[in-house]
Amino acid sequence: MTFIKTVAGLGRRISMAEKIVQTAGRDQLGDFAPEFAHFNDDVLFGENWNNEDIDLKTRSIITVVALMSQGLTDISFKHHLENAKKNGVTQKEIAAVITHAAFYSGWPKAWAAFRLAKEVYES
């Protein structure tokens, strides 16, 4: 039997084997956009995040940089910062990652990212 628990009430579940199971798409969009919910839950978080070619820590760093470079600093960005912390990215590492990415994606985007990162890592 596989034990699965809900993580942070965001529809993300992790089994004892650290397999990510996402339900946020179905939970929030359900019948309204079932195809999008499928891609979100089963493909993006199911297949992509569970692909073992890249470890979760590295995957989290890549995701934080990708979202930062788009200027996306909403609740989903904060959620991915929280995941990065849970996946072993230290405060020193996230600060270095955001600083490095600032030169490529823009200083204002880094400032916005730092505001949320500071909130996540100081809690």
Over which residues does each language-model region extend?
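Aromatic/hydrophobic pocket-lining residues that form the small-molecule binding cavity
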Residues: F77, I94
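C-terminal structural segments of small proteins and small subunits
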Residues: A95-F114
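Alpha-helix C-capping/helix-to-loop hinge sites
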Residues: G46-E47, V65-S69, A101-Y104
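Acidic, glycine/proline-rich low-complexity segments that act as flexible tails and inter-domain linkers
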Residues: T2-T58, K78, E82, K86, ...
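Short, solvent-exposed interaction modules
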Residues: Q70-G71, K86
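Winged helix-turn-helix DNA-binding recognition segment
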Residues: V89, E93
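Short loop/beta submotifs within extracellular cysteine-rich repeat domains
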Residues: T73-S76, W107
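Short, structured motif recognition centered on aromatic/hydrophobic residues
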Residues: R59-L67, V97-I98
